[in-house]
Amino acid sequence: MTEQKKINLLDLNREGMRELFASFGEKPFRSDQVMKWIYHFGVDNFDDMSNVNKKLKEKLKAECEIVAPEISVRQQAKDGTIKYALVLEGGQEVEAVWIPEKERATLCVSSQVGCALECTFCSTAQQGFNRNLKVSEIIGQVWRVAKDIGLDGHSEKRPVTNVVMMGMGEPLLNVKNVVPAMELMLDDWGFGLSKRRVTLSTSGVVPALDLLKEKIDVALAISLHAPDNALRDILVPVNKKYPIEEFLAACRRYIDGSKANKDVTVEYVMLNGINDSTDQAHALVQTLKGTPCKVNLIPFNPFPGNEYTRSSNSRIDRFSKVLQAAGITCIVRRPRGDDIDAACGQLAGDVVDRTKRLAKKKMRDDNAIAVNIHQA
């Protein structure tokens, strides 16, 4: 007879926790007490929950567990940024990045093992795709890193003040698990972050963005990276299915009903000679007309096997000035953690690729070499 798998409490939002505790014959406040121990004090041992009665502790120990991904590698950059490799059930790894600043500490978390969207300038996309992360594996990144930095429930300084869903994967291809995880980030019995301090970034899965609007209100960022469909089709292939005009219309629908968003943050990676000319800056101004937004220009962060190069500071400056002259708030993002491959677009993890993307690429490359040799 196989042993029944225990319920991981990190997989449950407040509603799920209260339903579970009701099935134990317990009142909602008992569920809230346990959530406070987990998320405010970083406790994962039921015996350490001093205001939980012995009978309930025994029930919890018999049927439940609190299990987050484990840290396998912790790398600290010169600027204080820390990149974590976190081991999942089954042995695969995802990466999360903690970015300290004077008044806040932002954690970039992953939503999938790998990514299926194949954006050409992103290291994660080159790893292929394996699976969606569970709720416990998403919120568990926040829990594990906060605990590593110093989550104890006593310090006034929070180890994590902001969370951005900008790590490995496309969050809107995992709405089922991303939404409950973000609910735990926002919940007062969870991490208690404000709506404006939790940001979801998407490459443009339009139907899922409309679905998100009905489920949760958080800050929205979009991976645009091109001023027109012709170029974006190449850089961000999901654009072939959901072109820019449809994507931006969905963004407007989302922020129209949002209290967390007055505008959308547009992310634009600066690729030398690809998308960084002043003509393209003017085209971007036209594309963004009618969409309340601010633009983050992101200097490209190189990774092995990629042929793109970073735009020069002068090209980025000229591009930025065109946007600013048109009245668009524009920020050039300073690379953080690039000396440990923790910057935007550099996260890779350890992915068993179910899409066989790497194998197919190698086969194409090998075939191209064979053709060249034959023609020589």
From Swiss-Prot:
Binds 1 [4Fe-4S] cluster. The cluster is coordinated with 3 cysteines and an exchangeable S-adenosyl-L-methionine. [4Fe-4S] cluster binds at residues 115, 119, 122. Its cofactor is [4Fe-4S] cluster. Pfam families: Radical_SAM (PF04055), RlmN_N (PF21016). Its EC number is 2.1.1.192. SUPFAM superfamilies: Radical SAM enzymes. It catalyses: adenosine(2503) in 23S rRNA + 2 reduced [2Fe-2S]-[ferredoxin] + 2 S-adenosyl-L-methionine = 2-methyladenosine(2503) in 23S rRNA + 5'-deoxyadenosine + L-methionine + 2 oxidized [2Fe-2S]-[ferredoxin] + S-adenosyl-L-homocysteine; adenosine(37) in tRNA + 2 reduced [2Fe-2S]-[ferredoxin] + 2 S-adenosyl-L-methionine = 2-methyladenosine(37) in tRNA + 5'-deoxyadenosine + L-methionine + 2 oxidized [2Fe-2S]-[ferredoxin] + S-adenosyl-L-homocysteine. One of its GO terms (biological process) is tRNA methylation. It comes from the Bacteria. The active site is at residues 95, 344. Keywords: 4Fe-4S, Cytoplasm, Disulfide bond, Iron, Iron-sulfur, Metal-binding, Methyltransferase, rRNA processing, S-adenosyl-L-methionine, Transferase, tRNA processing. GO terms for cellular component: cytoplasm. One of its GO terms (molecular function) is rRNA (adenine(2503)-C2-)-methyltransferase activity. Disulfide bonds join 108-344. S-adenosyl-L-methionine binds at residues 169-170, 201, 223-225, 301. Residues 101-339 form the Radical SAM core domain. InterPro entries: Aldolase_TIM, Methyltransferase_A, RlmN_N, RNA_MTrfase_RlmN, rRNA_lsu_MTrfase_RlmN/Cfr, rSAM. CDD domains: Radical_SAM. HAMAP family: RNA_methyltr_RlmN. Reaction proceeds by a ping-pong mechanism involving intermediate methylation of a conserved cysteine residue. PANTHER family: 23S RRNA METHYLTRANSFERASE, RADICAL SAM CORE DOMAIN-CONTAINING PROTEIN. Belongs to the radical SAM superfamily. RlmN family. Specifically methylates position 2 of adenine 2503 in 23S rRNA and position 2 of adenine 37 in tRNAs. m2A2503 modification seems to play a crucial role in the proofreading step occurring at the peptidyl transferase center and thus would serve to optimize ribosomal fidelity. This is Dual-specificity RNA methyltransferase RlmN. It comes from Pseudoalteromonas translucida (strain TAC 125).
